[in-house]
A protein has these predicted regions:
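Arg/Lys-rich, alpha-helical DNA-contact motif
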Residues: 1-29, 37, 41-47, 51, ...
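Key DNA-contact positions within bacterial/archaeal DNA-binding proteins
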Residues: 34
């Protein structure tokens, strides 16, 4: 495979396609794993769980998590506060 073949790898991933693992999400957002697991346990987010595999998140979920993490980290909103904001 030459360089032009490698550079031509171009494809679309739908915004709702679950492709990001928990580890990748945490690394991209700078979010501790325990926060992500808490949000899942509290039903604030609902990742896809393929049989016996890690949780997977879509770009849409990543955007939602980014907003949630901003509120938690910068505005000091608690998990219960996030629930009130999202589910009122």
């Amino acid at each position: 495979m030459d360089k032009s073949d490698r550079d031509s790898l171009d494809f679309e991933i739908r915004p709702d396609e679950p492709v990001f693992t928990s580890g990748v999400v945490c690394r991209l957002l700078g979010m501790p794993v325990w926060v992500l697991k808490t949000l899942d346990r509290e039903k604030i987010i609902s990742p896809t769980r393929p049989q016996g595999r890690d949780r997977l998140y879509s770009r849409m979920e990543l955007k939602k998590l980014h907003q949630i993490w901003y509120l938690m980290e910068k505005r000091k909103v608690t998990v219960n506060g996030i629930k009130v904001i999202l589910f009122k």
